[in-house]
């Protein structure tokens, strides 16, 4: 029997219809953020601009250099316009390695401020999409549509995301993290390495600095999932999964080695001399003050003396107690989740001052 051929247009229409919830989740936080920009008269609505602090005094010039190099008017390796000239790859790896940087090369150089705004909104929307993907994949039962809309929106508009829009290179961590955590689930449940290796390697390539922090959290998440998942993991299987986790992490690092090794050599040229860590025990802030950051309108500063940016919606204040009161959630899941939360809070207190 002859199969009916599907036209490309029909295929695209069907694909868009099937993925309509992903499109909604992408554009909802984007629309909210753009509305906030419009309210504050940010260009192109008003005369203000997204170019603030380091984004205005430093990053935008790197972006222009990146765009010029992409169009053949410069180099990704060496830059003669730096003070007395200098290598460029270290700058590229820290500020410019994100795939979202391609947005800046598609629009004219005169529209740089608009390009950066689009880049910011694209990262917000993509973070919501990857988080929704994660929720759909890990849910035992089919999640409700409203949950797949609300929680990704809260994730994409958490205070860290909004505040760090002025440091857009740091936002890739929120995009790759749900994919990496899903990879951890696949590794523990099925022993598959590729879903874990690929997003982790991409994270290290996109931004090595945020990448190592994501890697540390991934280790904690791996331990949490092994302890909290349904069904007991036999010691032999647990050991094999730990070995697989270590191998997968090593392979991801090797995949990103062309960036990591070059960055290390770049830092040896001078950046290491600016670090003066103090490993004495010290707390950065009062715990009660820390609690206030769970509420809206609690932003203080982006400077080191500022508090952690942990606000992700007032619903959390209700849902967290309900989680621990829910009888359908096992005690081992509550215990492991409580331990992980406690560990993260302790780490944010920064007992070792660096």
Predicted regions and their residues:
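Conserved small/polar residues in nucleotide/adenosyl-binding loops
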Residues: 352-354
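Start-transfer (signal-anchor) and selected internal transmembrane alpha helices
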Residues: 1-42, 243-245, 249
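Structural signal for the C-terminal ends of transmembrane alpha-helices
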Residues: 36, 107, 136-139, 183-189, ...
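Active-site lumenal/periplasmic loops and adjacent helix-entry segments of GT-C-fold
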Residues: 37-138, 142-178, 202, 206, ...
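Hydrophobic core of alpha-helical transmembrane segments in multi-pass integral membrane proteins
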Residues: 26-37, 317-321, 345-348
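Periplasmic/ER-lumenal interhelical loops and adjacent helix-loop junctions
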Residues: 53, 57-68, 99, 237, ...
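Membrane-interfacial loop-to-transmembrane alpha-helix junctions, especially the N-terminal start
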Residues: 21, 143-148, 191-196, 245, ...
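Membrane-embedded helix bundles of polyisoprenyl
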Residues: 30, 124-137, 144-188, 192-228, ...
């Amino acid at each position: 029997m002859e199969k009916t051929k599907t036209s490309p247009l029909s295929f695209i229409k069907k694909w868009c219809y099937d993925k309509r919830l992903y499109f909604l989740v992408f554009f909802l936080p984007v629309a909210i953020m753009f509305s906030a920009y419009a309210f504050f008269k940010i260009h192109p609505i008003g005369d203000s601009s997204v170019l603030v602090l380091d984004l205005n005094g430093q990053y935008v010039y790197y972006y222009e250099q990146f765009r010029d190099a992409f169009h053949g008017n410069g180099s990704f390796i060496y830059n003669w316009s730096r003070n007395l000239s200098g290598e460029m790859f270290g700058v590229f790896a820290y500020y410019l390695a994100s795939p979202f940087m391609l947005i800046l090369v598609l629009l004219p150089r005169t529209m740089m401020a608009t390009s950066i705004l689009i880049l910011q909104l694209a990262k917000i929307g993509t973070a919501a999409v990857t988080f929704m993907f994660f929720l759909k994949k890990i849910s035992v039962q089919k999640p409700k549509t409203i949950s797949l809309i609300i929680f990704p929106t809260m994730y994409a508009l958490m205070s860290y995301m909004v505040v760090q829009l002025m440091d857009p290179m740091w936002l890739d961590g929120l995009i790759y993290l749900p994919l990496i955590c899903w990879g951890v689930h696949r590794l523990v449940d099925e022993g598959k390495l590729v879903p874990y290796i690929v997003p982790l390697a991409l994270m290290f390539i996109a931004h090595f600095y945020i990448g190592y922090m994501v890697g540390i959290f991934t280790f904690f998440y791996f331990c949490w999932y092994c302890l909290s998942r349904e069904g007991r993991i036999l010691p032999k299987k647990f050991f094999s999964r730990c070995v697989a986790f270590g191998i997968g992490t090593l392979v991801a690092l090797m995949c990103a080695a062309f960036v990591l090794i070059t960055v290390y050599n770049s830092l040896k040229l001078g950046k290491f001399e600016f670090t003066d860590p103090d490993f004495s025990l010290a707390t950065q802030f009062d715990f009660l003050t820390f609690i206030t950051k769970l509420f809206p309108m609690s932003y203080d500063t982006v400077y080191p003396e500022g508090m952690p940016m942990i606000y992700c919606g007032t619903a959390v204040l209700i849902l967290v107690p309900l989680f621990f009161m829910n009888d359908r959630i096992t005690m081992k899941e509550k215990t492991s989740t409580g331990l992980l939360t406690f560990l993260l809070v302790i780490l944010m207190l920064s007992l070792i001052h660096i």
